[in-house]
Structures are given as structure tokens and as C-alpha cells.
Amino acid sequence: MKQRLEGRGHVVTVFDPIDLGLPLLEKPHFAYSSSQVPQKLQEINQALSTSDAYVTITPEYNHAPSPALVNLLNHFGSSTFSFKPSAIVSYSAGQWGGTRAAIALRPILSELGCLPVSAMIHIPKAQDVVDEDGTLRKSEDESEWDSYFERTFSQLEWWGEAAKRHHDVVDPFKASPAFRSSPSQRNAP
């Protein structure tokens, strides 16, 4: 996915929840006072906050998204993700391509404020379709997959560009200010 998006002219930053090594969530980024936020969380929050759009990639575990991905998302509040589009890519070893995980991820992303585009990418029998590095196997018809990915990427680009342009006209955080009168409200967009 990274190479495909870069090929479309995008700068892509990968946040692999396993590589980041965040602990099981006990205290999210927004629950710390600004001077107490762990540096790692602050760096991730800064990178996520400055992104124009998000592509989440998840395997399906027990009909649900990756616990590591959900843990990563839950470390940050909606003010990190708000007013930007997202796309969902899912995969599984079975015939459904992680569809159930993708559907479960949709309301999580919506609550974070990075509304998912309607088109999703599902990769069934991923072990037969892609190599461990994420490239399509030689036995796969690359043009067929590119055609499938196009709808999702086009929607994400359209919404990303529209949100960015409108943000230049109207600051969404002023139009819809965050509730910040108490610590319990810090997460609200």
C-alpha cells in the first residue's frame, strides 16, 4: 500500500503498532498534562495530527480488527484525527478478506473524527495474494488489483483534498470547538 500511495504522489508515514511498542493502554495521550506527556506519545501525536488522511490496515482476528491497531488508536483522542478522511484496508486468511474487522473498525474511526470513505479494500486469502513484505505475488494480476484499489484511493484523495481546502477557508476547530473545561472533555473534537 505504501508504494502504491507514494506512486500517486503522497508522502506516507507508516505507524506499525507492533514496531511502536506502545504499552497496553492505561493512560491516553490527552489525559496527561502537556508537560507530562511521554516523548514517544508526543512525537506520534504530532505526526498523526499533521497528516491529511489516514489509511488503516488490519488483519482480522476473531471477526475483529487487530488489537494492536485498536490499542494504538486509543492512545490518542479525536482531536488528533478530526476533520480528515480515512480508508480501511483489511485482510484475512479466509474468503472474506477481513470484512468483519473492517466493519468493526468503521465506528472507531468515525468516533475519532477521521470519517472512513465508503469504499474499502479487502484482501481474502492474503497468504496466497501478497508476500510478507506486502508486494503482490507474481501469480496475481497487478492491473486487476490496481483497478480494485483505485476506487478507495480516489475517494480518499477526493475527501482529503476537499477537507484540506475547506480547512484553509474555515478552521474546523473554531467552527466546532473542543470541550476543554475539564480533563474528561479533552478528547472531544
Located regions from the model:
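Mobile beta-alpha loop/short-helix "lid" or hinge segments that flank ligand
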Residues: T13-L24, S78, C114-T135
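N-terminal beta1-alpha1-beta2 submodule of the flavodoxin-like/Rossmannoid cofactor-binding fold
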Residues: M1-N74, R137-E150, K164-P189
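Short, surface-exposed connector motifs at secondary-structure boundaries
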Residues: D52-Y54, K84-A87
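Short, glycine-/small-residue-rich phosphate/pyrophosphate-handling segment
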Residues: P85-D128, S143-S147
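A glycine- and small-aliphatic-rich helix-loop capping segment at beta-alpha/alpha-beta transitions
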Residues: N71-S79, P107-E111
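Generic secondary-structure signature for well-ordered alpha-helical cores
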Residues: Q3-H10, S110, C114, D128, ...
